[in-house]
Amino acid sequence: NPDDVLVTTGSQQALDLISRIFIDPGDVVLAEAPSYVGALGTFHQYEAKVVHVETDDLGLVPDGLRAAIKSVRESGRKIKFLYMIPNYQNPSGVLLPAERRTEILNIARKEGIFVVEDNPYGLLGFDKPSPNAMRAEDSENVIYLGSFSKTIAPGMRVGWALVPPSLKEKLIIASESSILCPSNFSQLTISSYLADQPWRDQIASFCDLYKVRRDAMLESLDEYFPVTAKWTKPGGGFYVWVTLPEEIDTKALMPKAIVAKVAYVPGTAFYADGFGSWSMRLSYCYPTPERIRE
């Protein structure tokens, strides 16, 4: 429904607006373990306590969500929402199966918790289509975030939120108080591009390019990394999540990696509690296959 759409200055602004209207200092936000560093930073700015929810090779674990809710409620704290990236998650690259999405929505609905569904990578699948958006199953309890930053141009800073009617006015007021309105120039540019250009073909070409680079990274990891290391095998998006033996500190290793002209993000950046020191996020979206192998 177009009436449910709130245009934002990228989906990052939508995260800020949601945090502003929901979070009081000390409130709890549930998030996947690991989770997007930009979201964690926003929640921290509003003094939320982030409680990470267990994940596995398929994404967020429903029983882990039940356990996290129970633990937080028993501590007497308030849960304001669950933040998640179900499609090619950042940083893991995992695609959450449809049946888990339904189960997670049922849990959230039963417990009276909003779900913030962040979906910047949903159109960037290589191997199979993404399941339906979680908001398609529950428009009253899911806030859906979208962005053109990963599919058209990050510098345009145009995103959107699909919000329940009960929240839209609050989000509009919060947005007006911070930026007055998103850039009309950027919106008109995006609108014209979508109307006049073969944007679906452009995204398909991106997917073909990223798939080749993803394959090069996975092949290189198989060839060069030790058998004690593990990594995800994403079907889309930008990222591979690597888990090394626990004695390896990826943050301490970073200076040596930079000297060798290798860039990654240490795993601790994706946890609010400093966990994940033996993990790292690798990105294959920019370097060529030759550079990835090098």
Annotate each predicted stretch with a short phrase:
Residues 1-111, 122-137, 143, 210, ...:
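Conserved core of the PLP fold type I
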Residues 118:
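Glycine-centered flexible beta-alpha turn that most often forms the glycine-rich phosphate-binding loop
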Residues 136-138, 143-208:
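Conserved core segment of the aminotransferase class I/II
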Residues 162, 241-243, 283-285:
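Short hydrophobic/aromatic beta-strand micro-patches
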Residues 191, 208-218, 229-243:
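Conserved glycine-rich beta-strand-loop-beta hairpin in the small C-terminal domain of fold type I
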Residues 248-253, 290-293:
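Short, conserved charged micro-motifs
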Residues 259-261, 272-294:
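PLP-dependent enzyme catalytic core of the Aspartate aminotransferase-like
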